[in-house]
């Protein structure tokens, strides 16, 4: 079962400022785990006035202990014993300054065999006020949605279909006597594919519910820096945030 997260809120800043802050949001005091950001493609359509940007983020993270315990070592790849790892995130965004909206979609390029995460943002200038006074230039509406889908359950079902119903959750995920302790195998063996998938998605949803408010706070920090010191203060803040170890 796929898990979803959604949130709506408003920034007390104009759309132009918010859309600029989006591209300057890493790193910030709430996102020092972002090791690097590279722009790999950018194009402007003169007919529509839309700017399309593709970026690649490298993020450091720590896999939840419950997930580390759940997965056989063959699935942990380069993750450390404490679950520390890093992954690339591909982000595509489109900005339409004339119409006053921006949309972005980010997805993980690593760990897809464990969990696929698709995060979508929409930033929008409020519609003209009913009284006909024009736009509220000091606010921007935001909608964020995150879709979490574990791939492990799909692989278990497919491999069981090929190998027969006698295959255990551990065996179809690549675990074995050399890959996981017997105690761990016994625990996984008692789980059905749906339970494994649901557990990973549920743990990830709980983590998303905690991280998204922090991401919102991080954007507010960047917005405040833009308001008080412009681009210079933002760049100085980014430099300081990079120097702080997570």
Predicted regions and their residues:
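Terminal "cap-and-tail" regions of soluble proteins that handle hydrophobic small molecules
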Residues: 102-246
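Amphipathic alpha-helical protein-protein interaction segments
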Residues: 4, 8-12, 44, 82, ...
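Hydrophobic ligand-binding cavity/cleft-lining segments
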Residues: 1-72
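Hydrophobic residues positioned within well-ordered beta-strands of beta-sheet architectures
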Residues: 5-7, 53-55, 89-91, 104, ...
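Hydrophobic, Leu/Ile/Phe/Ala-enriched alpha-helical segments that form helix-helix packing faces
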Residues: 22-26, 93, 219, 223
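Generic structural detector for well-ordered beta-strands
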Residues: 8-10, 94, 122
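Glycine-rich portal/gate segments that line the openings of hydrophobic small-molecule binding cavities
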Residues: 40-106, 110
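Short solvent-exposed loop/turn micro-motifs enriched in small/polar/acidic residues
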Residues: 2, 86-88, 114-116
